[in-house]
Amino acid sequence: MDKQIIKLENIHKAYGDEEVLKGISLEIMEGEVVVLVGPSGTGKSTLLRCVNQLTIPDQGRVWVNGMELTDPSVDINLARQHIGMVFQDFNLFNHLTSIGNVMLGLTKVLGLKADAAYERAMKEMVRVGLQEKCDSYPGQLSGGQKQRVAIARSLAMDPILMLFDEPTSALDPELIGEVLAVMKDLALAGMTMLCVTHEIGFAREVSNRIVFMEGGVIVEEGTPKQMLQNPKLERTKQFLGKISEFH
């Protein structure tokens, strides 16, 4: 883990009078899995969206794989091709089949011919265990299956980094495991991942680092063992203890 994939330096973001991010700095190395936790409204999702510039910070700088994305001269669309993002509400096109959704970026963004795009998309559908659902439309899939299609769509673009914004929060409890299993497989394969999630079991088992945010700042960060068994701050212990009861 000696190659830096994400570097955030003094990130600030406000919406009107509300300062959501108050000078966040964070570095993530290649192959690292980092889980962001914290109360609602703490700025976790905003920070995640600053990484690929879906949200533009008011102040601060963002680097991904050595490229400064906050540099106005950077081709942000080109940079985003290498950053996968999975949202809590799937963001699939309902008029396309599962494999059509996975192929879309390959044909429209990368310019692959249909045969090559289909082959690459099918490989990722197999990877997430949905090869039997290639011709199904999103309306015919469970929430867990939709999220796995969304993950396959990101993976098909061969990203160097995956961002997950509460990928299981919209799912029925019995469907959460199938999505977490895919995420675990990605982590074991060495994918660099930044995840906003309260799935503490996943964080304990898979992550290298847990980052606790509150009030727009990083309160504490450390290994899962340190954060879950022996955090330095009472507030960290209180919050992680509470969400551990439910996850």
Give the label of every model feature segment:
Residues 221, 225-247:
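C-terminal boundary and immediately downstream tail of ABC-type ATPase nucleotide-binding domains
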